[in-house]
Design a protein with these regions (language model features):
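Bacterial Sec-dependent N-terminal signal peptides
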Residues: 1-22
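Mixed-charge, low-complexity segments
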Residues: 23-27, 49-50, 163, 193-372
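Hydrophobic/aromatic-rich core segments of domains that either
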Residues: 66, 106-178
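Alpha-helical transition-metal enzyme core signature, strongest for iron centers
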Residues: 68, 103, 107, 323
Length: 372
């Protein structure tokens, strides 16, 4: 009898647990939707609300997802104006103010809330497949690290879907916390690292409708790759992403466009670095010429008031060092990978002229001191 009771209890609990599955986040959803409108003007306040009400990663990401899916409306007027770029803050601010946006705004907001809630998260760019064909538009979604695993989230698709150039609204959680192996059946990221798969699909395999990699494949440790990527500066991240994309098989038109975008991002960074080096070199020159003029005034005043000889010699040495530092910076500019190079010729000329004049004054000073 006791044995039968145990079996009954086991079956009852199993059935009850399965029945309650859809309501697992019911309370989380209610709390997430109870946030006052005064706390939804920015993602920092939304994240603070979430952190004050939930203590697990799964509930935090659910609350963020629920809020986004229920409070950000799809902006159908901008259906064909998806701009894939790197400025997440601008995407977030624009959409939060209007409480509307397109996929990149949904992804940016969810990612921003998750990050500010203490979760590791990425907004991912790519394209999708549905009804047997690849969509011609770009798309964006999210990845969040929850309970030691990466999961994918697409709040845009749970708000509605595109079909034949039109957006049809709906509601649900079909694209909440989906496993990478399932998500790849409909979503292809430009960067294969963000498939979160040990054996990523090529772009061709995705286009042909395969749900997993075929043929002989090389193991890809995406966990280590993501960890290493987080430590890189943006320029190196772009370079690494471009290499991963180029190694992932023949690119589609959309992938080729992404590669061009990455190259443009790199070019902008190269040019920014060059501009900083150039401006710093000019600043060094201005300081050096200013110090040199003060030395000449001191000389013209018959080296009065008197200073230690070593101090006067050190002044000229310091000016030469400023000139040398400026020259080194200009050399780096000339070795730049930027397509649009800065012309350093004029600055190099005045630096060389100044260097010659300083060295002449060093000779004069030595001769002057030897006869004094």
């Amino acid at each position: 009898m006791k044995f039968l009771v145990m079996i009954f209890c086991f079956l009852f609990c199993s059935i009850s647990g399965k029945t309650q599955g859809p309501d697992e986040y019911a309370q989380t959803d209610r709390i997430a939707l109870s946030i006052s409108s005064s706390q939804t003007n920015n993602t920092t306040d939304i994240a603070a609300y979430i952190n004050s009400h939930f203590d697990t990663d799964s509930k935090k990401v659910r609350a963020a997802y629920t809020w986004v899916a229920n409070n950000i409306k799809y902006d159908a007027a901008h259906l064909h104006r998806v701009i894939l770029n790197e400025d997440r803050e601008e995407k977030v601010t624009w959409a939060i103010e209007r409480k509307s946006g397109v996929c990149e705004n949904f992804a940016a907001i969810l990612t921003d809330i998750c990050i500010k809630s203490g979760l590791k998260s990425y907004a991912i760019e790519g394209y999708t497949r549905g009804n047997g064909s690849v969509d011609q538009s770009g798309h964006a979604w999210c990845a969040v690290f929850v309970e030691n695993n990466w999961y994918l989230y697409d709040p845009t698709w749970d708000v509605g879907f595109q079909e034949n150039g039109h957006f049809t609204g709906r509601s649900g959680t079909s694209y909440f916390q989906v496993s990478p192996s399932e998500f790849i059946q409909s979503h292809m990221p430009f960067d294969p690292m963000f498939q979160f798969l040990d054996y990523p699909l090529t772009y061709e395999e995705f286009s042909k409708g395969f749900s997993k990699a075929t043929g002989r494949k090389t193991y890809f440790n995406y966990r280590d790759s993501i960890s290493a990527n987080e430590k890189l500066i943006p320029l190196v991240q772009y370079e690494a992403a471009a290499k991963r994309i180029e190694k992932n098989g023949a690119p589609t038109q959309k992938v080729s466009t992404k590669l061009k975008q990455l190259k443009m991002e790199k070019e902008i960074i190269y040019q920014d670095i060059d501009a900083d080096l150039y401006n710093s070199a000019v600043a060094d020159y201005k300081d050096a010429i200013g110090n040199f003029k003060m030395f000449l005034n001191y000389r013209n005043n018959q080296f009065m008031p008197a200073k230690p000889v070593a101090e006067t010699e050190a002044t000229l040495d310091a000016i030469l060092k400023q000139v040398a530092d400026a020259g080194d910076k200009l050399k780096k500019v000339n070795q730049s990978k930027a397509t649009l190079a800065l012309n350093t010729g004029d600055v190099e000329k005045v630096l060389n002229d100044l260097s010659t004049q300083v060295k002449e004054q060093q000779v004069f000073l030595r001769n002057y001191l030897s006869t004094a």
